[in-house]
């Protein structure tokens, strides 16, 4: 889960805010002496200070310009629930996260995405160029196993008439989809493992099953559920635009957008210990705008 580290920073940020200025009250007492709130605050600031002040500052700046609704956060949260299936809650717990803290980070990420979108120049010519290689979303089921021998065993059972959905429930190691017969959410080009995606798009008719596909995750058998024929540019423009914007939400473009927002906010760092917190966002060496993309 790529966003868990940032969620941890959100939790630490909240702790630092609570500790700031608390003074000499002890948080831990021992016969050898006490650990005070001030000592804890300074230690946390030394270790996490730059990352925490970045997120707190950017959140303040972005909330002044952009709005993220509870509905948007919940929709994003649901994606992770579906992606991780039965292991979602244990994944949060193992990273010392709660539903609330994870949603707070999702809200922050959505703010950054909106700032990045606002910094894009989505021209007609760029969309038409993107349309040439764009394909509509495809829906498939899959069975994931660890070894080729098991995949061949499943392949034989399919040829003998056993149902794909039943075999997915029995064999698939993808716990997020196995209970649902291996059904994946619709996806488009560039969203999945390259070899998996190529094999999925090569399927032509509903219920067609691929050969054994080796990906970075293991061995797959893929069954086509739904494949929509690509329409004209005029018909598909809204879908093309959404996919194009999604493709441009890269680290480079997000950083460029945050640099622009930071410059406009006239930031003044008062704590000398944090003077370098925004060094990566005030340098002029990297690309200054997402408008050069595609």
UniProtKB/Swiss-Prot annotation:
Known EC number: 5.2.1.8
Lipidation (N-palmitoyl cysteine): 22
GO biological process, one term: protein folding
The organism of origin for this protein: Listeria monocytogenes serotype 4b (strain F2365)
Keyword hit for Transmembrane helix: no
GO cellular component: plasma membrane
Gene responsible for this protein: prsA1
Lipid-attached positions, S-diacylglycerol cysteine: 22
InterPro entries: Foldase_PrsA (IPR023059), PPIase_dom_sf (IPR046357), PPIase_PpiC (IPR000297), PrsA_foldase (IPR050245), Trigger_fact/SurA_dom_sf (IPR027304)
Name this protein carries in UniProt: Foldase protein PrsA 1
Cited SUPFAM superfamilies: FKBP-like, Triger factor/SurA peptide-binding domain-like
Keywords in alphabetical order: Cell membrane, Isomerase, Lipoprotein, Membrane, Palmitate, Rotamase, Signal
Protein purpose: Plays a major role in protein secretion by helping the post-translocational extracellular folding of several secreted proteins.
Family: Belongs to the PrsA family.
